[in-house]
Amino acid sequence: MSIHLVIIDALNLIRRVHSVQSDPTDIARTITTTARTLNRILNESKPTHIIAVFDHHLQDRGWRAEVLPAYKQNRKPMPEPLMKGLDAIQQAWWELGIDSLLSDGDEADDLVATLAKKVADHGETVTIISTDKGYCQLLSPTLQIRDYFQHRWLDKPFIEAEFGVKPEQLADYWGLTGVSSSQVPGIPGIGPKAAKEILTTYPDIETAFLAEDLPKKYRKKFDEHIESARVCKLVSALKTDIDLGFNLQDIRYEAVS
């Protein structure tokens, strides 16, 4: 039997639903709305296996903040009513047949990436439900990303139109441009247009840095900020080697009647 694993980027979905509620303390409304959303996802994607991955809620910002202290330093904390309601949300999702993977320190992005790549590398179909374009670096013939809220696939043509690079170059792209929302600086003075030009000519940051024909307008920037670019690429890249502690059989989807 062919496998179709659906991975829900849980807080990505929950926070978007919660943020548009008129009453942020009404967690029952959050539960109802997310359950309705998940039922639509189940009906549309028809998974054989499914799991919702949650970030940890500790003050520790993970390994990325260790190598780049400013990483996500200014990110707004989760609203307290939502934080207190997460257990109830997870229970409601469990009753729909969707188990939750709760991180005890790793970022959800890395957990999602590890599971998705592991299954896709075996030739099975994987769909990640998220608006996070960071997952697009994982794109492959059997791995796809669905932006449920915009009703679109974050696929290779989308990435080429949005960024002008290949999916496998996205970490290099963000290493150059930075990611302002996560306080990732990149190389000062190199924006999207320049990054596209550089990565159209060279496959990655290191090749560009070592190239004798790197245009003069970029040479000084690279020489002065190459270490920043390397660190920013590192934190932009997803880890795919985390020990998950479970197997596919544990997350087989069985429709609840």
Swiss-Prot record:
<keyword id="KW-0378">Hydrolase</keyword>
<dbReference type="InterPro" id="IPR038969">
    <property type="entry name" value="FEN"/>
</dbReference>
<dbReference type="Pfam" id="PF02739">
    <property type="entry name" value="5_3_exonuc_N"/>
</dbReference>
<dbReference type="GO" id="GO:0017108">
    <property type="term" value="F:5'-flap endonuclease activity"/>
</dbReference>
<feature type="domain" description="5'-3' exonuclease">
    <location>
        <begin position="165"/>
        <end position="254"/>
    </location>
</feature>
<dbReference type="GO" id="GO:0033567">
    <property type="term" value="P:DNA replication, Okazaki fragment processing"/>
</dbReference>
<feature type="region of interest" description="Interaction with DNA">
    <location>
        <begin position="189"/>
        <end position="194"/>
    </location>
</feature>
<feature type="binding site">
    <location>
        <position position="185"/>
    </location>
    <ligand>
        <name>K(+)</name>
    </ligand>
</feature>
<keyword id="KW-0460">Magnesium</keyword>
<feature type="binding site">
    <location>
        <position position="109"/>
    </location>
    <ligand>
        <name>Mg(2+)</name>
    </ligand>
</feature>
<dbReference type="InterPro" id="IPR020045">
    <property type="entry name" value="DNA_polI_H3TH"/>
</dbReference>
<dbReference type="InterPro" id="IPR029060">
    <property type="entry name" value="PIN-like_dom_sf"/>
</dbReference>
<dbReference type="InterPro" id="IPR022895">
    <property type="entry name" value="Xni"/>
</dbReference>
<keyword id="KW-0255">Endonuclease</keyword>
<keyword id="KW-0238">DNA-binding</keyword>
<feature type="binding site">
    <location>
        <position position="187"/>
    </location>
    <ligand>
        <name>K(+)</name>
    </ligand>
</feature>
<feature type="binding site">
    <location>
        <position position="190"/>
    </location>
    <ligand>
        <name>K(+)</name>
    </ligand>
</feature>
<dbReference type="GO" id="GO:0030955">
    <property type="term" value="F:potassium ion binding"/>
</dbReference>
<dbReference type="InterPro" id="IPR008918">
    <property type="entry name" value="HhH2"/>
</dbReference>
<feature type="binding site">
    <location>
        <position position="176"/>
    </location>
    <ligand>
        <name>K(+)</name>
    </ligand>
</feature>
<dbReference type="GO" id="GO:0008409">
    <property type="term" value="F:5'-3' exonuclease activity"/>
</dbReference>
<keyword id="KW-0540">Nuclease</keyword>
<comment type="function">
    <text>Has flap endonuclease activity. During DNA replication, flap endonucleases cleave the 5'-overhanging flap structure that is generated by displacement synthesis when DNA polymerase encounters the 5'-end of a downstream Okazaki fragment.</text>
</comment>
<protein>
    <recommendedName>
        <fullName>Flap endonuclease Xni</fullName>
        <ecNumber>3.1.-.-</ecNumber>
    </recommendedName>
</protein>
<comment type="similarity">
    <text>Belongs to the Xni family.</text>
</comment>
<dbReference type="InterPro" id="IPR020046">
    <property type="entry name" value="5-3_exonucl_a-hlix_arch_N"/>
</dbReference>
<dbReference type="Pfam" id="PF01367">
    <property type="entry name" value="5_3_exonuc"/>
</dbReference>
<keyword id="KW-0630">Potassium</keyword>
<dbReference type="InterPro" id="IPR002421">
    <property type="entry name" value="5-3_exonuclease"/>
</dbReference>
<dbReference type="GO" id="GO:0000287">
    <property type="term" value="F:magnesium ion binding"/>
</dbReference>
<keyword id="KW-0479">Metal-binding</keyword>
<dbReference type="GO" id="GO:0003677">
    <property type="term" value="F:DNA binding"/>
</dbReference>
<dbReference type="InterPro" id="IPR036279">
    <property type="entry name" value="5-3_exonuclease_C_sf"/>
</dbReference>
